[in-house]
Amino acid sequence: MIATLLSSLLLTGPISAGAETQGLLPAQDLLPDIGTSAGATLSIDQEMAMGDFYVRQMRASAPLIYDPLLTQYINTLGNRLVANANSVRTPFHFYLVNNDQINAFAFFGGNVVLHSALFRYTDNESELASVLAHEISHVTQRHLARAMEEQQRLAPLTWVGVLGSILLTMASPQAGMAGLSGTLAGAQQGIISFTQGNEQEADRIGIQVLQRSGFDPQAMPNFLQKLADQSRYVSKPPEMLLTHPLPDSRLSDARNRANQMKPHPTASSQDYLFAKMRILGMYGADENSLTPELLDKLSKGTVREQLAAKYGQAVQLYQAKKYDEARNLLQPLLAQQPGNIWFLDLMTDIDLGQNKSAAAIARLQNAMVKQNDEPVLQLNLANAYVQGRQPAAAIKLLHRYTFAYPNDPNGWDLLAQATATQGLRDQELAARAESLALSGKLTQAIGLLSDASARVKLGSLEQARYDARIDQLRRLNERFRKYQKS
């Protein structure tokens, strides 16, 4: 039932003409581009604005993982798929929620959310990519906007209530489903039918996106089969089947379409294996996910898997605060790959865990000679500067980082720490305000910026900048209030 609502779609207008016909499927199986069919309900600008609103609400209420390495990985993977999709009119943003239930969804503004459990239950990168391709296809086909049109035909609906229930579902699936059911009321059956059609449509288009992006198209039916098998042996089906209906026809259709494509077995990237190790070792309720059996299996596998096993062992040792053992395991890996950001990030954490900020700073500065624009290294170095009591250096680097990545709370939080250490109260307040604004706490953010403005010289450039930002946030707050009332 949620699947239609859980998926946003704002995109239209093909990226490249003829991309759908490049030997992917027989002509009769190709799907028409229907991305513009929902234009009567919401414009792209309106969807973008609503997406911004709900992303901010999500930051405030959902257990998002703000891990720079994982954020960079899922956005790189996601945008690789987006580059091979049609009807893309907005940027895409991918988020990771710390949730042990298998699920993913998309909503307004090209925003796609993955549960961390997907890394636990996917056997390879193609399976993970198949989930992303499915959600991206929901977006490019504008299924959420089309669902709104369908709902308007069936019965009035408060869409803020629906999307609010979606966000609640991330933290508490049962409560979210209950809230959604109450909102949908008597129109449920029509929406359910519409949803099942959307799911199959997203599968069909997603398989094409998957293949064009260089992944194995069989990964989609394989993962769907895995979900179906799991539901047969447990009393409660996987959460993903509650939000993404899986009738037999959907599974058989996905398998048939994948079988029509040229086989394309694809090895998982090193980054996928590292990300899997990191999530198993650092996130989720199960502290025993990085089992000796799994690490032993990987250590006997391919070269990439062997390297992932060593990284996983180092993560495990770091989490147990066995810093010397973790360092001894990681040091040879760094010697072989001195620019590897996964190794550099973990070694920085080990250094800071042992109060060796000077060593971390020296290593990161050396790495940034060749990777000056690498955001993961910038954040690591800024954090090392803060921990090493070099706030001036941190502030300089973080001004650059927050300018390039204004929607990352990590940068603003570190900047607030650094400016506080320097006694720059107005700048600290402004940085804290930006972090609050990203979580939708606009009234509080405006209050902090007003305080910052009052602390600087009357008529100064700093005051003009703070006041201009206050005006922006006030306008944004007024717009968001309309969404909350609608």
From Swiss-Prot:
Keyword vocabulary terms for this entry: Hydrolase, Metal-binding, Metalloprotease, Periplasm, Protease, Signal, Zinc
Catalytic residues (positions): E135, D203
Enzyme class, UniProt record, top EC level: hydrolase
Transmembrane segments: none
A single Gene Ontology CC term: periplasmic space
Keyword Ion transport: no
EC number: 3.4.-.-
GO terms of biological process kind: chaperone-mediated protein folding; proteolysis involved in protein catabolic process
Cofactor note: Binds 1 zinc ion per subunit.
Cofactor: Zn(2+)
GO molecular function: metalloendopeptidase activity; zinc ion binding
HAMAP family: Protease_BepA
Protein name: Beta-barrel assembly-enhancing protease
Organism of derivation: Yersinia pestis
Gene for this chain: bepA
